[in-house]
């Protein structure tokens, strides 16, 4: 568990609201309001919702669940409202695979990089202008799977943590700490000063990734957007660049696939911090 990720709510705590299900007033349910930046967001899908309910840093406003899905709910301080699948379809974005369950909750507050470092993180991912929310969610999920406790994103040119990201992350946004920074290059300098070996992925590098991460006590993996890759200033700020060896017939990997491979390689090749 990453305690830092669980201690940055927009608002502290969650209002106790009982344990039994109730039925909402249906007219209000069918008037969805657009999400505003910094305001409450909808999260949906079993893994995303269960993880949000288990996170004490989440302030949950509403828990909507169908009759079929209510049996899967753990005991919670949040009173579930029984709805139909059609109700959820109307409330959530088109195409949302909700599995009969959704919550409306305040977003988690991003942490400061210095706090993540002080917390004792040894594996951190840094994303340079990765803008696709599905890729971002998948990267959160891989980070959680391979022991990366922090994900550094740009304040701009990176998507907010919406329900789409949360669904792709399968609950990992509740345990992997989000950090936002204006300047990725400066963040890499800060990581280097804290003893992190910063490795940027670049297909043109002659150095294989397994050699670049071998023996590092603290590691930061840096990934750029698909197509352009790392920006020149960000690449220059990395301690070194490395590549994932792939077949010559393929030019590159999807950024979320590359992240999963890189995180695995780093977790396998790095050494525990003293």
PLM features per residue range, with description:
Residues 67-69, 85-88, 156-158, 183, ...:
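Short, ordered loop/turn segments at secondary-structure junctions
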Residues 119-206:
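RNA substrate-binding interface of SAM-dependent RNA methyltransferases
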Residues 134-138, 230, 255:
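Short glycine/serine/threonine-rich phosphate/pyrophosphate-binding segments
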């Amino acid at each position: 568990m990453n305690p830092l990720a669980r201690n940055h709510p927009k608002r502290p705590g969650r209002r106790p609201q009982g344990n039994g299900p109730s039925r909402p007033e249906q007219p209000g349910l069918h008037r969805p309001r657009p999400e505003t930046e910094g305001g409450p967001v909808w999260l949906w899908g079993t893994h995303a919702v269960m993880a949000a309910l288990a996170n004490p840093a989440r302030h949950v406003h509403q828990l909507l669940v169908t009759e079929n899905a209510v049996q899967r709910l753990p005991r919670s301080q949040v009173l579930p409202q029984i709805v139909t699948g059609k109700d959820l379809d109307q409330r959530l974005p088109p195409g949302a695979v909700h599995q009969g369950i959704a919550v409306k909750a305040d977003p988690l507050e991003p942490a400061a990089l210095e706090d993540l470092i002080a917390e004792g993180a040894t594996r951190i991912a840094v994303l340079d202008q990765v803008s696709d929310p599905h890729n971002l969610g998948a990267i959160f999920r891989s980070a959680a799977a391979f022991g990366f406790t922090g994900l550094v994103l740009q304040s701009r040119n990176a998507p907010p943590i919406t329900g789409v990201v949360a669904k792709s992350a399968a609950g990992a946004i509740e345990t992997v700490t989000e950090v936002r920074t204006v300047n990725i290059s400066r963040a890499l300098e800060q990581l280097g000063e804290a003893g992190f070996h910063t490795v940027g992925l670049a297909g043109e590098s002659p150095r294989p990734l397994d050699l670049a991460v071998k023996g590092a006590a603290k590691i930061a993996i840096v990934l750029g957007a698909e197509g352009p890759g790392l920006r020149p200033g960000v690449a220059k700020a990395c301690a070194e660049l490395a590549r994932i060896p792939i077949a010559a017939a393929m030019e590159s990997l999807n950024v979320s696939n590359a992240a999963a491979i890189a995180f695995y390689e780093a977790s396998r090749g790095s050494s525990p911090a003293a």
